[in-house]
Amino acid sequence: MAGCDDGEILLLAGYPFHMKQPAERMSQLFDKYDSILRQVLGSEVVGVYSMGSGAIPGMVGSPMIDILLAMRNAPPTEDQLSKLKEIGIGLIGDGKSPHDPSDTWFQNLDFPTQGNFEEFKANGAHPPDGYLGRLIVHFCPYQSQFVHNSLCYVKYLKQNKDAFNRYRAVKIEGARMQCDGNEIKGGESGMSAFRKYKMHKSKVVKDLIEESKTWGEKEGNFNLPRELM
């Protein structure tokens, strides 16, 4: 896109939006949590996957990562909630994700004592919401359609250049409209710049989700990982 600086970081009400994601460090963070989640939750874990923008190489956006945690049971039991709390992971609100009824979502509120997370700290402390080191965990039953659709969506955007470009373009457009210091912010709705950015891209995201479902239904385009079948 013209005028796009790969090294540029925009701020949306204080939330960083990277024109070039710190992909290697995001992958390192995912690997650390993949290992710890499997250790803590044991055999109830079927699979741990990267989802959302952070799972799509070359995509712009927040450096936060989204982890899709495919479980044999869902929603989480009290014992599982306790185990997640011990590694610094707590429910977002009441845990009911707006994405899907089968999705119980969490965020990391502190780093686990297992492993070394020093490189992900900000000024020696757990980073603020929206920054590298923060993440969302989607706790879902492994056979749910949400798991299937989330993984199919990522593969579709990895393989379809037009879909990738449309998603990237609307994200950049929305971020530039709402970045700190930009006067083109619309009326005083009381809605945060980050929320306005999310709404700006929602129509394109909805279209891409439906496209990915149609694409995934064609033989040979998408297969679930073996452990989910």
Task: Please place each PLM-identified region on the residue numbering.
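Short amphipathic alpha-helices in soluble, non-transmembrane regions
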Residues: 79-88
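Catalytic cores of NTP-dependent nucleotidyl/adenyl transfer enzymes across multiple folds
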Residues: 134-229
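Short amphipathic alpha-helical segments
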Residues: 15, 63-67, 133-135
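Short histidine-centered catalytic/ligand-binding loop motif
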Residues: 15-25, 68-72, 152-157
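Helical scaffold of the NTase/Pol beta-like nucleotidyltransferase catalytic core
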Residues: 1-49
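Short, flexible turn/loop "capping" segments at secondary-structure junctions
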Residues: 9-12, 59-62, 129, 148
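Conserved catalytic core of two-metal-ion nucleotidyltransferases
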Residues: 88-143
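Active-site nucleotide-donor binding segment shared across nucleotidyl transfer reactions
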Residues: 36-78
